[in-house]
Amino acid sequence: MENLIIYAFIYLLGSIPFGLILAKFFAKTDIKKEGSKSIGATNVLRVVKEKNPKLAKKLAIATIILDFAKAAIPLLTLKFLHYDQALLWSVAVLAILGHCFSIYLLFEGGKGIATGAGAMIVLLPLEVLTAFIVWVVIGKIFKISSLASLAALLAFVVSSFIFNYDLEIHTHAPVFIIAFIIVYKHLPNIKRLIFKEECKVI
């Protein structure tokens, strides 16, 4: 029963669309109706930038921090309280599911990058560092957020086998589930990348 309460709480917390809330409150803009219609930091930056570039950067950074924290803080807390790895991985997946398929937005949501990073920094920090380096390099070269994110995701999955071939839960299934969710949410971006129609944001 305790685990079910934790799972429900994490999903509901992960579902909070911080980007949407911040853009509506501070920029009076509904990012669900503009840009890519995503609730993540990239769309916050893209949409708000048209009206107020300085505010756009602040709101995008705040969105990243809050989306990151809504997974990282609960996982850190549960890890500190010595909950087992199986529960921690379940919580990680649920936090990302909540962000990508928010109950508050009729199961629409963001792309899962910041929330995924927040979850994984607790469980696989070295892999997240590797992914971040790849994200920065690809972002600097191509200036395309989705391409950088997908490259970072690939680096994360590959490095999870290099640095942690045998995870404590004895399976990489949660890593693949998380990767699948994020790739699924990026399918429109992948299509635009293939046809060279993806916008440069970074």
Curated annotation (Swiss-Prot):
- What Gene Ontology molecular function terms does this protein carry? acyl-phosphate glycerol-3-phosphate acyltransferase activity
Q: Which reaction does it catalyse?
A: an acyl phosphate + sn-glycerol 3-phosphate = a 1-acyl-sn-glycero-3-phosphate + phosphate
Q: What is its EC number?
A: 2.3.1.275
Enzyme class, one word? transferase
Write the protein's name. Glycerol-3-phosphate acyltransferase
Which lineage do the record's taxonomy fields give for this organism?
Bacteria, Pseudomonadati, Campylobacterota, Epsilonproteobacteria, Campylobacterales
**Which Cys-Cys disulphide bridges does the record give?**
none
Metabolic or biological pathway: Lipid metabolism; phospholipid metabolism
- Respond yes or no to whether keyword tRNA processing is given for this record: no
> What membrane topology was assigned to this protein in its record?
Multi-pass membrane protein
User: GO CC annotations?
Assistant: plasma membrane
Name the domain of life.
Answer: Bacteria
Q: Which NCBIfam families match?
A: glycerol-3-phosphate 1-O-acyltransferase PlsY (TIGR00023)
One Gene Ontology term from the biological process aspect of the record: phospholipid biosynthetic process
